[in-house]
């Protein structure tokens, strides 16, 4: 299976660089994965596509203010993208610099000195030497790490809009974007309808934006991300399945978490890392339907939705979305694949 099979041409003006005024004002392309039937809707119509007995699974990870700036002791400028926090004084980060800092050297993260303990590929392990910890530095100086394709600096409103309304567990460097469409009002309507809700956690890593760089899909190595699928979520899923309801994953992060926990055919609680890679030919044991945004060409995420719904149907749906001027990527419109 070739990576080029998952390519498509997207007019640049369809990349959504800014969010709409209201979260739930986006559009929703409905795709029947059995028949390939496509229908255009408003996102708020989603309430009509779900029934009591269905279970919606959301990712409650919260985006960190992960972009920070600093310098070497020589004054040379540095830019950080915090990837993973080990403890308040110890963290993994990407560093953008003219010349890479050496292991053992001391550098500034904003106004605070840190020591470079290790380097693995493009990832540095830093330990803060000063009084402040990484949480305080992010709180005081941090920026929302917008995806590179937005081609703009973060603005004040991004701190709210690039975060889901139910975000709780700090740790992502990118938003679980399918959840951005859900307003507090829509969440309330879902509850009022008698549809059950559950939360898992997957902390999205920067690898989510990494294009597949090998020719053969099967030889791609996925980045690892930290997930938590609690016992009570597994119980809800079993109950939903037994009663004939559907498990509807909100976003590919929820899909990957649930399918990791259900890899043996039976959903089990899971805490730890996942590098699950779902591409055509892979089986889904847990998820019956999903809400997802439109994904980048040749990305692992367009491969995931192609595994769920069949590649030809997905490419056709994307062609329809382009023709109908849907908005693409993180701040863009969504699909309901069922």
UniProtKB/Swiss-Prot annotation:
A Gene Ontology BP annotation from the UniProt entry: queuosine biosynthetic process
GO molecular function (one): S-adenosylmethionine:tRNA ribosyltransferase-isomerase activity
Gene3D superfamilies recorded: QueA-like
Family matches, as InterPro entries: QueA, QueA_dom1, QueA_dom2, QueA_sf
Keyword Signal: no
GO CC terms, sorted: cytoplasm
Name of the protein this chain belongs to: S-adenosylmethionine:tRNA ribosyltransferase-isomerase
């Amino acid at each position: 299976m070739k990576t080029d099979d998952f390519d498509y041409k997207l007019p640049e003006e369809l990349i959504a660089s800014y969010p709409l005024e209201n979260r739930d004002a986006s559009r929703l392309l409905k795709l029947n994965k059995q028949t390939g039937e496509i229908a255009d809707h408003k996102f708020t119509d989603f309430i009509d596509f779900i029934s009591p007995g269905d279970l919606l699974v959301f990712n409650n990870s919260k985006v960190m203010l992960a972009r920070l700036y600093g310098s070497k002791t020589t004054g040379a400028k540095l830019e950080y993208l915090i990837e993973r926090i080990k403890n308040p004084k110890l963290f993994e980060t990407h560093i953008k610099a003219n010349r890479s800092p050496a292991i053992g050297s001391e550098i500034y993260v904003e106004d605070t000195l840190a020591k470079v303990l290790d380097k693995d590929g493009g990832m540095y392990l830093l330990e803060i030497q000063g009084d402040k910890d990484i949480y305080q530095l992010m709180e005081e100086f941090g920026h929302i790490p917008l995806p590179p394709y937005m081609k703009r600096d973060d603005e004040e409103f991004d701190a709210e809009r690039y975060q889901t309304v139910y975000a709780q567990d700090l740790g992502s460097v990118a938003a679980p974007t399918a959840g951005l469409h859900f307003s507090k009002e829509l969440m309330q309507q879902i509850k009022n309808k008698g549809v059950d809700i559950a939360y898992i956690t997957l902390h999205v890593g920067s690898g989510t934006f990494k294009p597949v760089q090998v020719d053969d899909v099967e030889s791609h190595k996925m980045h690892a991300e930290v997930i938590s699928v609690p016992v009570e979520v597994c119980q809800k899923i079993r109950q939903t399945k037994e009663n004939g309801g559907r498990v509807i994953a909100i976003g590919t992060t929820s899909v990957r978490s649930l399918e990791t926990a259900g890899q043996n055919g039976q959903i089990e609680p899971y805490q730890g890392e996942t590098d699950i890679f779902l591409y055509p030919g892979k089986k889904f044991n847990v998820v019956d339907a999903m809400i997802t945004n439109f994904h980048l060409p040749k990305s692992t995420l367009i491969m995931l939705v192609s595994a769920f719904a069949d590649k030809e149907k997905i490419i056709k749906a994307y062609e329809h979305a382009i023709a109908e001027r849907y908005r693409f990527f993180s701040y863009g419109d969504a699909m309901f694949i069922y």
